[in-house]
Design a protein with these regions (language model features):
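Catalytic core of pol beta-like nucleotidyltransferases
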Residues: 1-26, 35-40, 51-102
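Conserved H-loop
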Residues: 32
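Short hydrophobic/aromatic beta-strand micro-patches
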Residues: 47-49
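Short, conserved active-site loops that position catalytic residues or coordinate cofactors/metal ions
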Residues: 42-44
């Protein structure tokens, strides 16, 4: 599994973000789209891991604003690379069950 299993709109969104910020290290699809339990109400959960990030909250706000250009079902989650590990409960779940896109 990988990029080919990711909704096209999510790929376009990630490509757009990568052009704006080349400091993206990795991206993951997680949640219902990753585990195959998609419903009509499912959002598209994306973990976006940055090499360095001064403020995850500010980046989270920016990512949420930028998603409006694509689809409000996209649910981006910003992480610093240094925080994206098994000691972070959400990151741990993503590492175990998510699909690495880039």
């Amino acid at each position: 599994m990988g990029k080919e299993n990711t909704p096209e709109i999510a790929i376009k969104y990630i490509d757009f973000i990568k052009k704006r910020d080349p400091g993206i290290k990795k991206t993951y699809l997680f949640g219902s789209y990753a585990n195959g339990t998609i419903t009509a109400d499912s959002d598209i959960d994306l973990a976006i891991v940055f090499d360095s990030l001064a403020d995850t909250f500010d980046m989270q706000v920016l990512l949420m604003k930028l998603r409006r250009k694509f689809d409000t079902k996209i649910e981006p989650h910003a992480f610093r690379d240094s925080d994206f590990n098994s000691s972070n409960p959400l990151a741990n779940e993503i590492l175990k069950h998510g699909i690495e896109i880039y």
